[in-house]
Amino acid sequence: MDVTRFSIPVETAAPGGETNAYLIGTDPAVLVDPADRTDELDELVEARGVEHIVLTHTHPDHVGGVDAYAARTDATLWAHRGHIDQFRSATGREPDRLLWPGSEISIGDESDRTETITVLDAPGHARDHVALVVSDGGPVVCGDCAIRDGSVVVGAPEGEMRAYMSTLRRLWAIDPPELLPGHGPIIDHPREALERLLEHRMRRERRVREAVDAGAETLEEILETAYEKDLAGVRELARATVRAHLEKLAVEGRVVWDGERASPSEP
């Protein structure tokens, strides 16, 4: 199935300041994550015809063009069935249909629907995050689950670290030929990228736990120990990330965390 990527300039914390939108299929097509309207995307949407609009998640840097393209194409607008209010708030639109893990979105006429996109549950970066498998054994549109260079923000309270790491392992097990991310270039060695992201998270988690074991209690104290780099400009993101790691460690019984102070778990 044909997949076309559009890098759209938007206000985003992601490196490069762009979000990837995707058109999947040809006449008709599925539009994924229209972050904003652009002339180039307008032209191809008009040429191909869009039958469905789907979001990997409803963060602001992924939804800016939803209202315009929904009105322009009369496409079916899909929302995660567990997060309908969040969808309405983010897009200003009512969904036409609801999706959930395992849903299949078919493309084409009723008499010839041979192309399908399968929805995967992929929470962590966001609670409503899904990934999309393009045809059987095809690439996966992974949104903000993965990025080729750097790391993905998983910050509490919106992000959930335990879920995110499970999502990375799920994608690793699927082993798609490519990952099509929400930001940056296509990931053509998915398992290598997913292993790198998992190792990054496990390394940060070790440093958070070591900080707590060494006596750091508050977020600020743990932050200073868990990060070696200069946090100028990204301190709030780092703080949210540390909180997400602490919540994961607390659920697993490896630290005590009450939302304000941390302490080592009892042996």
Model regions and ranges:
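Residue-level signal for the nucleotide or nucleotide-sugar donor/cofactor binding architecture
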Residues: 19, 64, 159, 237
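C-terminal regulatory/interaction regions
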Residues: 211-267
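Hydrophobic residues on short alpha-helical segments
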Residues: 194, 198, 202-213, 243-247
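Active-site HxH/HxHxD metal-binding segment of metal-dependent hydrolases
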Residues: 10-17, 34-115
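Histidine-centered divalent metal-coordination motifs
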Residues: 56-62, 125, 183, 245
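Metallo-beta-lactamase
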Residues: 111-123, 127-205
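Conserved beta-strand hairpin/beta-sheet module of binuclear metal-dependent hydrolase folds
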Residues: 1-46, 131-148
